[in-house]
């Protein structure tokens, strides 16, 4: 545990480093901390913080900078999110960008764009997962022995399957089959529907059972679409000296964007937690670049978490500004998708 004096000095150091990007010396800490301490006392406290792994000393400067561990303590226990931005203006911009009624993929892509524009860093969104259950199905007769199966998921995603049947079905028979499935099985997975059909087979005519089994088989044979990571504003990070000043670091950053595997894992981890999460660079393999951090939040459709969004930027970012941007965007994206 840090005593109040050490906490104040660490908080001041990190705030000044975020603002100025320069190692922070004892004179700056004396000026901004509000504490009446001698330079020698401040240096002693800094030495203690360095031994604790909360700050480090660059070789080229007498000042100190925060470590990933120092940033973690700061965002977990010292950060006050009183955004220096107009939250209502941010909400209006997000609402104007996310238009209800647009295709889901377009709305999600717009969320990545607005995150990038507001933060001036990179916006990232893990698109909604394909549902394993269905809300409604329809059969449409195309020709003799060819039927179009239309599946609507709870998220509003529409999927089509072609069915080749051993016999022809009339429109009224197709309506009867879809009405039965929607009335008895909506909200279940197709594996559950298959099990239920076995139990109820005696209640159905043989030709209807054949059609329903064909629909269930076609639905489960198609592999799930892979989770997709959408990124907007990568070029903004070229303007961030902390990330772009070193060519090896820059190459590693764009490898993260190109491969997306690490981002997918990070966003998936975030989707299992409530509210805003902050991933500090260098803390774990999830964020392999010490100078990069990610602020994320899950978003929902009708109360169910379906994806994650966030901002990728430098570890030296104004967290009190970025956190509300991510939080507001996640809430309004959830609202927009739930209204579709």
Curated annotation (Swiss-Prot):
Repressor listed as a keyword: yes
Listed Pfam families: HrcA, HrcA_DNA-bdg
Keywords (A to Z) from UniProt: Repressor, Stress response, Transcription, Transcription regulation
Family annotation (SUPFAM superfamilies): GAF domain-like, Winged helix' DNA-binding domain
Record bears the keyword Protease: no
MF GO annotations: DNA binding
InterPro entries the record matches: GAF-like_dom_sf (IPR029016), HrcA (IPR002571), HrcA_C (IPR021153), WH-like_DNA-bd_sf (IPR036388), WH_DNA-bd_sf (IPR036390), WHTH_HrcA_DNA-bd (IPR005104), WHTH_transcript_rep_HrcA_IDD (IPR023120)
GO biological process entries: negative regulation of DNA-templated transcription
Xref: NCBIfam families: hrcA
HAMAP family: HrcA (MF_00081)
Function recorded in the entry: Negative regulator of class I heat shock genes (grpE-dnaK-dnaJ and groELS operons). Prevents heat-shock induction of these operons.
Family per record: Belongs to the HrcA family.
Name of this chain's protein: Heat-inducible transcription repressor HrcA
Native source organism of the sequence: Burkholderia cenocepacia (strain ATCC BAA-245 / DSM 16553 / LMG 16656 / NCTC 13227 / J2315 / CF5610) (Burkholderia cepacia (strain J2315))
């Amino acid at each position: 545990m840090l005593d109040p004096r050490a906490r104040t000095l660490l908080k001041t150091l990190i705030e000044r480093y975020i603002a100025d990007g320069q190692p922070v010396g004892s004179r700056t800490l004396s000026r901004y901390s509000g504490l009446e301490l001698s330079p020698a006392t401040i240096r002693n406290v800094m030495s203690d913080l360095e031994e604790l792994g909360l700050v480090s000393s660059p070789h080229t400067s007498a000042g100190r900078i925060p470590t990933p561990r120092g940033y973690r303590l700061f965002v977990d226990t010292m950060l006050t999110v009183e955004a220096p931005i107009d939250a209502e203006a941010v909400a209006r911009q997000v609402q104007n960008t996310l238009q209800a009624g647009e295709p889901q993929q377009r709305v999600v892509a717009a969320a990545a764009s607005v995150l990038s524009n507001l933060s001036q860093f990179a916006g990232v969104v893990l698109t909604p997962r394909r549902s394993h259950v269905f809300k409604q199905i329809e059969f449409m007769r195309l020709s003799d022995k060819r039927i179009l199966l239309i599946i609507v998921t709870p998220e509003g995603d529409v999927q089509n399957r072609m069915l080749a049947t051993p016999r022809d079905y009339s429109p009224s028979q197709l309506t009867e089959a879809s009405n039965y499935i929607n009335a008895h099985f909506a909200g279940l997975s197709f594996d559950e529907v298959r099990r239920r059909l076995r139990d109820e087979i005696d209640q159905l005519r043989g030709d209807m059972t054949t059609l329903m089994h064909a629909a269930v088989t076609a639905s489960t044979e198609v592999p799930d679409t892979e989770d997709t990571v959408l990124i907007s504003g990568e070029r903004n990070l070229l303007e961030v000296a902390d990330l772009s000043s070193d060519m090896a670091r820059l190459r590693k950053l764009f490898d993260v964007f190109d491969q997306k595997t690490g981002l997918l894992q990070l966003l998936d981890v975030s989707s299992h937690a409530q509210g805003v999460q902050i991933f500090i660079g260098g803390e774990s393999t999830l964020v392999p670049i010490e100078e990069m951090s990610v602020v994320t939040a899950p978003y929902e459709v009708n109360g169910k978490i379906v994806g994650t969004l966030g901002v990728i930027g430098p570890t030296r970012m104004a967290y009190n500004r970025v956190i509300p941007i991510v939080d507001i965007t996640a809430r309004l994206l959830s609202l927009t998708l739930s209204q579709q």
